[in-house]
């Protein structure tokens, strides 16, 4: 199993990150919070990972913090929650927000996450409430991302729409969310603001 990767950040195209580790490129899927925290292309980075093995593929999922990776591992234990949906949940809200909603049993708020219907939200609350006891309000990482002015705002917005679609949003909804964000922001900032527009 691969527990972490340490190398040069080669590319960022949500939801995927490409890391060069001694000449080998590892493709890693990650929640948006990790994109905000990881740095810029060319930086030396370290990602905690979880290897997910299926019949048809071996996938790597990456996380900027142990708290996120731990919640991911708990989420994929829930019946009906796959790795992709778990990444979508972690992209839609912070670990603390999720733990808080589960703790108070706020299933309706969880249905605002793409792909999470009423039954799935209720199952998340029921199955995870006991498992998340003691998580409290763990320190969430303070993410600071550099805002880089894009020379091609249209392409940035198109890439942001694609990223939101890959996180489970419908095309029309993703397009509407991105169009509401001001132009000239980095890809990460555009996605972050689009996700913030969905009030959870």
From Swiss-Prot:
One of its GO terms (cellular component) is Holliday junction resolvase complex. The keyword DNA repair applies. Residues 144-154 are annotated as: Flexible linker. Keywords: Cytoplasm, DNA damage, DNA recombination, DNA repair, DNA-binding. The keyword Kinase does not apply. It comes from the Bacteria. Residues 1-64 are annotated as: Domain I. This is Holliday junction branch migration complex subunit RuvA. GO terms for biological process: DNA recombination; DNA repair. Residues 154-200 are annotated as: Domain III. GO terms for molecular function: ATP binding; four-way junction DNA binding; four-way junction helicase activity. Has three domains with a flexible linker between the domains II and III and assumes an 'L' shape. Domain III is highly mobile and contacts RuvB. Coiled coil: none annotated. Homotetramer. Forms an RuvA(8)-RuvB(12)-Holliday junction (HJ) complex. HJ DNA is sandwiched between 2 RuvA tetramers; dsDNA enters through RuvA and exits via RuvB. An RuvB hexamer assembles on each DNA strand where it exits the tetramer. Each RuvB hexamer is contacted by two RuvA subunits (via domain III) on 2 adjacent RuvB subunits; this complex drives branch migration. In the full resolvosome a probable DNA-RuvA(4)-RuvB(12)-RuvC(2) complex forms which resolves the HJ. Belongs to the RuvA family. The gene is ruvA. Its main location: cytoplasm. It is found in: Cytoplasm. InterPro entries: DNA_helicase_Holl-junc_RuvA_I (IPR013849), Hlx-hairpin-Hlx_DNA-bd_motif (IPR003583), NA-bd_OB-fold (IPR012340), RuvA (IPR000085), RuvA_2-like (IPR010994), RuvA_C (IPR011114), RuvA_C_sf (IPR036267). SMART domains: HhH1. The RuvA-RuvB-RuvC complex processes Holliday junction (HJ) DNA during genetic recombination and DNA repair, while the RuvA-RuvB complex plays an important role in the rescue of blocked DNA replication forks via replication fork reversal (RFR). RuvA specifically binds to HJ cruciform DNA, conferring on it an open structure. The RuvB hexamer acts as an ATP-dependent pump, pulling dsDNA into and through the RuvAB complex. HJ branch migration allows RuvC to scan DNA until it finds its consensus sequence, where it cleaves and resolves the cruciform DNA. Residues 65-143 are annotated as: Domain II. The lineage of its organism: Bacteria, Pseudomonadati, Pseudomonadota, Gammaproteobacteria, Thiotrichales.
């Amino acid at each position: 199993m691969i527990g972490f990767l340490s190398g040069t950040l080669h590319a960022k195209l949500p939801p995927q990150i490409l890391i060069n580790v001694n000449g080998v490129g590892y493709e890693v899927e990650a929640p948006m919070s990790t994109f905000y925290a990881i740095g810029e292309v060319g930086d030396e980075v370290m990602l905690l990972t979880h290897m997910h093995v299926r019949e048809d593929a071996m996938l790597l999922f990456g996380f900027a913090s142990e708290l996120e990776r731990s919640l991911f591992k708990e989420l994929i234990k829930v019946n009906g929650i796959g790795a992709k949906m778990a990444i979508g949940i972690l992209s839609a809200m912070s670990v603390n927000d999720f733990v808080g909603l589960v703790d108070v049993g706020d299933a309706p708020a969880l249905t605002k996450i793409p792909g999470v219907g009423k039954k799935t939200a209720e199952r998340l609350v029921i199955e995870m409430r006991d498992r998340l006891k003691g998580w409290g309000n763990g320190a969430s990482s303070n993410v600071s991302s550099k805002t880089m002015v894009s020379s091609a705002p249209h392409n940035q917005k198109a890439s942001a729409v694609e990223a939101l679609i890959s996180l489970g949003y419908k095309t029309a909804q993703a397009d509407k969310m991105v169009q509401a964000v001001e132009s000239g922001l980095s890809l990460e900032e555009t996605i972050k603001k689009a996700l913030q527009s969905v009030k959870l």
